[in-house]
């Protein structure tokens, strides 16, 4: 059963979204607080095909440790009205594997995400949280002119949301773990469509 989280003073981003009439927030992942949650999400049937992390909780704990120690990325928990519902990894593209597949600029950012709670499927929530996290990355560093993505070509639902979130397909690339669509979201276009 989902429980509303305690009031959180350590939110990295929080904004009411009038399209879904709910507040979308992000906070840094905390291992002790979020381990069981992330483990449960990684073992959800809808998450396994993309993330391939259906593993024992000890493996997820090690994965969290690696991510928290990695200077090129930060893990976040996404919340809707205070309830945890998604996991995000924000990364600096130039320092990521993806940076070898296109001419990455120093401040290009990217993200990986999963919606862990099936109760949040539908009702326009996924595009809203994608736009919110993309906005967060643009706000987090004014030098970021582009947010990039590399969803699997098999991630049809996510690819369907891309245009509604100002992401433009650049072509397909073969990454070590998947065939992916290279997607760019330019700051200027995002601001024109959604504002900051």
From Swiss-Prot:
Disulfide bonds: none annotated. Pathway: Siderophore biosynthesis; rhizobactin biosynthesis. The keyword Hydrolase does not apply. It comes from the Bacteria. GO terms for molecular function: N-acyltransferase activity. It holds the Pfam family Acetyltransf_8. InterPro entries: Acyl_CoA_acyltransferase, Acyltransferase_MbtK/IucB-like. Gene3D superfamilies: 3.40.630.30. Keywords: Plasmid. One of its GO terms (biological process) is rhizobactin 1021 biosynthetic process. The keyword Transmembrane helix does not apply. Belongs to the IucB family. This is Rhizobactin siderophore biosynthesis protein RhbD. It comes from Rhizobium meliloti (strain 1021). The lineage of its organism: Bacteria, Pseudomonadati, Pseudomonadota, Alphaproteobacteria, Hyphomicrobiales. The gene is rhbD.
